[in-house]
Amino acid sequence: MTPATRQEVLGLYRKVFRIAKNWQSASGQIEETMREKEYIRNEARTLFRKNKNVTDPNLIKQCIEECEARIEIGLHYNIPYPRPIHLPPMGLAHKQGRTLRHQERLRKISKPIYLKSHDEVS
């Protein structure tokens, strides 16, 4: 990782924690605000630690873009949680042969950039 990239990543990490510090939930309730602040901090720690050993410059760039997208979406919609994705038609076809490969390809294509680090939950 180049020093400039390292500085950019650390800047994003600090930015996420500053956002969490000043976060207000949409409902304005103190309990919900505290839960959302904790979620933001835990999510940042988890994803940054998960990707800390990434050395491929293209993959690092994708992770940076994902982080920036999550920040912008969270601030715009005032929700700290990732927005749900909707599978395309035939995204849940029977798991056999070519149909399975086609289903996996559809799921990969439909996954937005802000969810690339998240594992799929079945």
Curated annotation (Swiss-Prot):
Gene Ontology CC: one annotated term: mitochondrion
Listed InterPro entries: Complex1_LYR_dom, Complex1_LYR_LYRM1, LYRM1
Family from the record: Belongs to the complex I LYR family.
Protein name: LYR motif-containing protein 1
